[in-house]
Amino acid sequence: MAQADRTASEKLGIPAAVLMERAAMAVRDEVYAILGTGRPAAAADSLTAGETCAAGAGAESGRTGDCRENTGTGSGRAFRAAFVCGKGNNGADGACAARLLLEDSTAGGCGHRQVLVRVFTMAPPKEGTPLRAQLHTLHAYGCREEPFSQEALDAFAPDLIVDALFGTGLSRDLEGDALSAVQGMNRVREQGGAAVLAVDIPSGVSSSDGRILGECVRADETVTFAFYKRGHFLYPGCRACGKVVCRPIGITKKALQAKPEMFTYLPQEDPPERILPERDPAGNKGTNGKVLVIAGSLNVAGACVMAAGAAYRTGAGMVKVLTVRENREILQETLPEALLDTYSGSSAQSAREALQKNLGWAGYALAGPGLSKSEAAKEIVTELLLEAPSKLKGLVLDADAIRLIAENDLYALLRACAESIPVILTPHMAECAALLRIETGELKEDPATWLKNFAKLHHCTILCKDARSTVVSYDERKVYLNTSGTNALSKAGSGDVLAGMVTALLAQGMRAFDAAAAGAYLHGLAGVKAAGLSGDARSVMARDLLRVLEGLPEEFAARS
């Protein structure tokens, strides 16, 4: 965020003071909205998450100075807003917002009840800093800041606490006075019933990866500026953000070009359903995509049903399943719409011959769900990577196919294949870590960077499944962070459904990155819908996703 501020100031000519004023106006408006004083907040994108008198309209006008004895107007007790300001720009934003509340009192205000303002700081600000300048202006309105203390905050009994302690630049664990301030704000929220509004991101939450840096403020709402940050959506920090509101302050995408990773592609900014392919009214089963699903093994027939069924439900015109002979009867009974071919799971030669026969039929293939890591499965994956460039238009690799690539060092074949046709990998975190040959914990620290480097090296697209799935591609600067979904999707077979969906979207002509992003988004929506119909996320099964997929892609295509 600091880099974006500098770029906006240096390259676009927007003074830093103007950006701060606009940010403070956004904070001020959210204060009014939360306290219900009647001032409508300006247009904003949103997701779900010294004491001086600022009087609203209808109040006695113009009073500033010490208001500790003021009990408000005839409409009731005055609201109390405590601003806890750190020494950096985040604290200056908070102090500036407090000053705007005081200006409203002088001008007659816009609310219906007074807002009593008290500003707490952590240390005397240094000369020449934005915070020092904002506090100096506050003094002109009769407002004097005071050092933060738990006793003073408790005694003030605020209705609202504005957390302006730390912004997006925090990267170390909280300690000392800062930790005490965070604990104090949480205490007043929990025991005193105060609402908490965080400025940019709750203090103690890493804006880059959502980590909790020791401890964090538990906000009811977060107002951020210009663009969302990854920490607003990544666990565990996203749970501390409450409702997240994004307000424009003049930092444009042009100002962000110096820092490409800020182009995090979120549904709230550009819904992926907008890029779903149009259905040709004169099309036929052949023109809507022919998908070969290579899945299943002995006693693992469900993966075939989930993946192939999802491909059909997401719009594929024809689907054929290639699996072991033991699964034939189950497939014919549960998914009669699918074409079917089988091979001997104990014979690598049988598997290779069946694959070669069927690759010529399909335009696109999905390999991996429930495939196992047998010699026959290894032969299929190896042969598939060799033959796909000349036989297919696109390939999706999931589950055991990814494990086989990692365990048998098939990276060179993967890259050669991906240089010829679009290849999408859909691993979960553990499979992805195995593919990258790192520990899962290391991957979780910075998934976007790890995934981006691998995608560039191997010329592919990766959809890494997690509570917040991430999509990257070698040819796409954006990183898509999916925010749809529910823990109802934490069930066996859910990933097979997703893989089938992504393959179907690819087969209908979508770019690999777009197919992966839209697939992840729709899959999450399907989980939410299934959980809503069942009434309990615990009871949702993968087959329920197939039921709710009916109409879902078309419903969102119509909204684009």
Tell what function each PLM region has.
Residues M1-T121, G128, R132, E221, ...:
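Small-residue (G/A/S/T)-rich helix-start motifs and N-terminal tracts that mark the onset
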Residues T129, Q150, L165:
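Short amphipathic alpha-helical segment within the helicase RecA-like ATPase core
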Residues A133-L138:
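Conserved nucleotide-cofactor-binding alpha/beta core module
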Residues C143-R144, C460:
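Short aromatic/hydrophobic-glycine micro-motifs
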Residues R144-A157, E353-K357:
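Short acidic low-complexity segments
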Residues E151, I201-S207, R230, S347-A348, ...:
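Short acidic loop-to-helix transition motifs that present clustered carboxylates
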Residues L153-D159, C216, L359-G360, A418:
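A short, aliphatic-rich alpha-helical micro-motif
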Residues P158-L160, L165-E261:
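Internal gly/pro-rich beta-alpha loop/helix module
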